[in-house]
Curated annotation (Swiss-Prot):
SMART domains (alphabetical): GAF, HATPase_c, HisKA, PAS
Natural source organism: Solanum tuberosum (Potato)
Alphabetized UniProt keyword annotations: Chromophore, Photoreceptor protein, Receptor, Repeat, Sensory transduction, Transcription, Transcription regulation
Protein name: Phytochrome B
Keyword Repeat set for record: yes
Pfam family, one: PHY
């Protein structure tokens, strides 16, 4: 179907069962599938070639049956050589290969002499030695100016970025697009006839093509997010509008390597191909590799006879044509095109970022071929190289947009999976295991399937389309017999997986994924055969098409695909297997924990490890950050959640004339910025406090003092949300750069004030690097600061193309995506749409990486007509770059901590359920009174821990919206639970605990949130024990209750609780964190601060009192007294 298509059937590459595992296993599996497909491709190619040599018709149906046969290694090598070094080109252009050092011709196409008018017949006066042959100096074939251009191109580092080069034949004067690329033995020059003889028109045409691509890109970027179908529909319309092909389609490659037409724009009278699925071998792996190397492929006329390439006999192997725009199509593909009535085609590769394993190698290896955008035409069609180049830019933008949409879809899917897993685990532990099948959500909601089942303790719980109980028992016996040492199994074909009873299941159950929970308990997911889900919107088979099963045609491709997937389900995707594997691990751990008795010890060990991990690193990062802020030569300031200054470094104080002391507490918006910047500053704050961090925003700061009167300071800032340990936003930090000098110059420059040349070429350090473009994106200005920044002189740069030639070849960019973005910015500016502070990075002449901000404005003449663009570059100071690096390091560490915390909160639930279950078993036994009290204390601690990890949202505590869960409880039970939490620490430190608590407290029943009160008191007591003198020290708990009757016969218990220790007590910074700081310094301080706020929510209060020889917490709390006792524990 698409360019590079060959024969039309693939033996399914995942026929054997695969064990469920991680994405790394899945990646290796995908590689093995691709390698296996190479064999199938080579076999089909050999069958096609043999049929041609023997004069027999290539029987499509018979070829389908032979793809499973093995292929000798030499046959695969021959096949790959044929694909990559076929020795023929298309006749719409000619090709010359040259030795790079000597310019000597080493190969040429047989039509080159005629096309370049070099034959003696066409030029009778031509000397024989000038006729093109092996060894000819290629420069003698073209005009002197053309030769100079070729010499310059040969010296370029990235030669392809200079394409196309406009050159003329020496003898005829005919113009050509020269498209150059390097191969292993030299440089290949593809020559395509140009349609105009004016080079200026050629450049203008190229720019016009780019403008059309930019317009299409802008349309793509304006689409609403979350709709990949709309994105694909839009891109086919844009490509068809750009190129004029009769039909344009988007092909998507699925994980099992087969393809599908997911979008189509066509002439109304053509048969639709939307919805067509085709076998993996329709586009062989070798062709897919070529698309990653050469992302645009044009076939002008499939009926045209390919032209042979003649080469130097000293070359060891045929010339590599992988990167050639003229490479001839393979015979089977040309035949396929002819059969479907498509004479010409254009194929554009859609490249997106690969997965983590693919990205290890970096560069092109980190990119993945997602699919193709293909244009078909019913007559001969050729589009010039500049337009094809513009289409390539459009594909890069489409790939970027698609990548973002795929990442968003993946994140939403992952959230759904995590939520479903959590609900299933909770359901399993709260109820009975069959609940994950019988209730909602069920295990069918985890992955796409037609049925699912649980086999638990010999009982069968089916849901949806599933085998019968007798059949599932047979499957379980087969699994234990042949896959007993595995942790799971997945297959899209039970017959191919070797299950002997597959025939009895029919088409209803073809694919199966199974997860072993224990050696006797299993989870199953089932899928029916694929064909029932796939429909093609194309025309029905016509009775007159008698050879339809044998001819290579889209309809026969679809038929072949249905044959391939017969008795198969859709394959289990990597993400689906990861979800199943994750649920399996969680359930296995849950089953074990419910049976184990030492779960509590595991929880404590895990929590202890979590508490210590990473603290030293975070402290180090925090100290480094503070030092950088204080000493930086970049202006840095910070505000709290109300927008008031709480950080103000020396540089911003110097710029504004406002000292640190004067700035503290002032409103950034109302006191420190100009009126015209107030809206911008308010938006910055609003977004940052919601977690959206704006970058490169310009604000105008006021200045104070006699010397600063009526001056303004312009700073470009990045807004960074300041977060506490639990990821709550507590303020905003602004890391800025002073651009006042550049701003003044730029304003004068744009308004054509002052002496133009004096401004541009001034060596004054306040003059920023400036370059300019004419209407055709050629460089027309390159100032002194730009020379210093890049290492390239004005004379070397002016007149060259900014996109590709300057930024691309001279100043290398990081990949084609960066060039696409730069091209869009430049064309937008020429079109009147200014771009401000665009992140722009490149390598200078010496290979140093330069990170900058690019501002592009339209350039007008005295009459107001647009004549190009001005571009200004701002460079971040070293201090700012270091500050940003440290900020990213801190964010990464905080994110890592958050992930670990989320993991702990999730994983700790199962051991806690195990403790709860153990407690419930103990309650049913004969216990002494003391044992009952211990059990009650254990249950109280377990409830406290469950509530902490369930309600971890500190923001609700901060703003006073935490929901309290009130109940009746014994006050004595709370005290016992609180004391139990410090007993181990007391023993370790050798500290004595003194309890001065009235006996009646034990049976006093009150009403309130027992778990929160217990949490608060335990934290205060724990911190006092931590800082008590050791050894031989002591801590005293002194409780004084009093009864206060109020209206309606209700009595309130007024509690005064003192926690006392001798000596100095808590460190001052801990007390500071507890009472005053919104940006805590210590973990203990955060805990005490949260507990103080929780106590306040319960209408209580806390004081910390330091006396000469002792210190103590004084906790005051009023709780309503109740007459009935609390419900039984458990």
């Amino acid at each position: 179907m698409a360019s590079g298509s060959r024969t039309k059937h693939s033996h399914h590459s995942s026929s054997q069962a695969q064990s469920s595992g991680t994405s790394n296993v899945n990646y290796k599996d995908s590689i093995s599938k691709a390698i296996a497909q190479y064999t199938a491709d080579a076999r089909l190619h050999a069958v096609f070639e043999q049929s041609g040599e023997s004069g027999k018709f290539f029987d499509y149906s018979q070829s389908v049956k032979t793809t499973t046969q093995s292929v000798p290694e030499r046959q695969i090598t021959a096949y790959l050589t044929k694909i990559q070094r076929g020795g023929h080109i298309q006749p719409f252009g000619c090709m010359i290969a040259v030795d790079e050092a000597s310019f000597r011709v080493i190969a040429y196409s047989e039509n080159a002499c005629e096309m370049l008018s070099l034959t003696p017949q066409s030029v009778p006066s031509l000397e024989k030695c000038e006729i093109l042959t092996i060894g000819t100096d290629v420069r003698t074939l073209f005009t002197p100016s053309s030769s100079v251009l070729l010499e310059r191109a040969f010296g370029a580092r990235e030669i392809t970025l200079l394409n196309p080069i406009w050159i003329h034949s020496k003898n005829s004067g005919k113009p050509f697009y020269a498209i150059l690329h390097r191969v292993d033995v030299g440089i290949v020059i593809d020559l395509e006839p140009a349609r105009t003889e004016d080079p200026a028109l050629s450049i203008a045409g190229a720019v016009q093509s780019q403008k059309l691509a930019v317009r299409a890109i802008s349309h793509l970027q304006s689409l609403p997010g979350g709709d990949i179908k709309l994105l694909c529909d839009t891109v086919v319309e844009s490509v068809r509008e750009l190129t004029g092909y009769d039909r344009v389609m988007v092909y998507k490659f699925h994980e099992d390597e087969h393809g599908e037409v997911v979008a189509e724009s066509k002439r109304s009278d053509l048969e639709p191909y939307i919805g067509l699925h085709y076998p993996a071998t329709d586009i062989p792996q070798a062709s897919r590799f070529l698309f990653k190397q050469n992302r645009v492929r044009m076939i002008v006329d499939c009926h045209a006879t390919p032209v042979r390439v003649t080469q130097d006999e000293s070359l060891m192997q045929p010339l590599c044509l992988v990167g050639s725009t003229l490479r001839a199509p393979h015979g089977c593909h040309a035949q396929y095109m002819a059969n479907m009535g498509s004479i010409a085609s254009l194929t554009l590769a859609v490249i997106i970022n690969g997965n983590d394993e693919e990205a290890v190698g970096g560069g092109r290896n980190s990119m993945r071929l997602w699919g193709l955008v293909v244009g078909h035409h019913t007559s001969v069609r050729s589009i010039p190289f500049p337009l094809r180049y513009a289409c390539e830019f459009l594909m890069q933008a489409f790939g970027l947009q698609l990548n973002m949409e795929l990442q968003l879809a993946s994140q939403l899917s992952e959230k759904h999976v995590l939520r479903t897993q959590t609900l299933l685990c909770d359901m399993l532990l709260r109820d009975s295991p069959p609940g994950i099948v019988t209730q909602s959500p069920s295990i069918m909601d985890l992955v796409k399937c037609d049925g699912a089942a649980l086999y638990y303790q010999g009982k069968y719980y089916p849901l949806g389309v599933t085998p019968t109980e007798a059949q599932i028992k047979d499957i379980v016996e087969w699994l234990l017999a042949y896959h007993g040492d595995s942790t799971g199994l997945s297959t899209d074909s039970l017959p191919d997986a070797g299950y002997p009873g597959a025939a009895s299941l029919g088409d209803a159950v073809c694919g199966m994924a199974v997860a072993y929970i224990t050696s006797k308990d299993f989870l199953f997911w089932f899928r029916s055969h694929t064909a029932k889900e796939i429909k093609w919107g194309g025309a029905k088979h016509h009775p007159e098409d008698k050879d339809d099963g044998q001819r290579m045609h889209p309809r026969s491709s679809f038929k072949a695909f249905l044959e391939v997937v017969k008795s198969r389900s859709s394959p289990w995707e990597n993400a689906e297997m990861d979800a199943i594997h994750s649920l399996q691990l969680i359930l296995r751990d849950s089953f074990k924990d419910a049976e184990a008795s030492n779960s509590k010890a595991i929880v404590h060990a895990h929590l202890g490890e979590m508490e210590l991990q990473g603290i030293d690193e975070l402290s180090s990062v925090a100290r480094e950050m503070v030092r950088l802020i204080e000493t930086a030569t970049a202006p840095i300031f910070a505000v709290d959640v109300e927008g008031r200054i709480n950080g103000w470094n020396a540089k911003v104080a110097e710029l504004t004339g406002v000292s640190v002391e004067e700035a503290m507490g002032k409103s950034l918006v109302h006191d420190l910025v100009y009126k015209e910047s107030q809206e911008t500053a308010e938006k910055l704050l609003y977004n940052a406090l919601r977690g959206e961090e704006d970058k490169n925003v310009e604000i105008k700061l006021r200045t104070f003092g006699a010397e600063q009167l009526e001056k303004a300071v312009f700073v470009v800032v990045n807004a960074c949300a300041s977060k506490d340990y639990t990821n709550n936003i507590v303020g905003v930090c602004f890391v800025g750069q002073d651009v006042t000098g550049e701003k003044v110059v730029m304003d004068k420059f744009i308004n054509i004030q002052g002496d133009y040349k004096a401004i541009v070429h001034s060596p004054n350090p306040l003059i920023p690097p400036i370059f300019a473009s004419d209407e055709n994106t050629c460089c027309s200005e390159w100032n002194t600061a730009m020379e210093k920044l890049t290492g390239w002189s004005r004379g070397e740069i002016v007149g060259k193309m900014l996109v590709g030639e300057i930024f691309g070849s001279c100043c290398r960019l990081k990949g084609p995506d960066a060039m696409t973005k730069f091209m869009i910015v430049l064309h937008n500016a020429i079109g009147g749409q200014d771009t401000d502070k665009f992140p722009f990075s490149f390598f200078d002449r010496n290979g140093k990486y330069v990170q900058a901000l690019l501002t592009a404005n339209k350039r007008v003449n005295m009459e107001g007509d647009t004549i190009g663009a001005f571009c200004f570059i701002q460079i971040a100071s070293p201090e700012l770059q270091q500050a940003l690096r440290v900020q990213r390091q801190q964010e990464k560490k905080c994110y890592s901590q958050m992930k670990e915390l989320a993991y702990i909160c999730q994983e700790i639930k199962s051991p806690l359920n195990g403790i709860r279950f153990t407690n419930s078993l103990l309650e049913a036994t004969n216990l002494t009174e003391n044992q009952k009290q211990y059990l009650e204390t254990s249950a109280a601690c377990e409830r406290q821990m469950s509530k902490i990890i369930r309600d971890i949202d500190l923001e609700n505590i901060e703003d006073g919206s935490l929901t309290l869960e009130k109940e009746d409880f014994f006050l004595g039970s709370v005290i016992d639970a609180v004391v139990s939490q410090v007993m181990l620490l007391l023993r370790e430190k050798g500290v004595q605990l003194i309890r001065d608590i009235p006996e009646e407290i034990k049976t006093l029943t009150v009403h309130g949130d027992q778990v929160r009160i217990q949490q608060v008191l335990a934290d205060f007591l724990l911190n006092m024990v931590r800082y008590a003198p050791s050894p031989d020290g002591w801590v005293e708990i002194q409780l004084r209750p009093s009864m206060m009757p109020i209206s309606d016969g209700v009595t309130v218990v007024h509690i005064e609780l003192r926690i006392i220790c001798p000596g100095e007590g808590l460190p001052p910074e801990l007390v500071q964190d507890m009472f005053h700081s919104s940006r805590w310094v210590t973990q203990e301080g955060l805990g005490l601060s949260m507990c103080r706020k929780m106590l306040k929510l319960m209408n209580g209060e806390i004081q910390y009192i330091r006396e000469s020889e002792r210190c103590y917490f004084l906790i005051i709390l009023d709780l309503p007294m109740t007459r009935k006792g609390p419900k039984s524990v458990g």
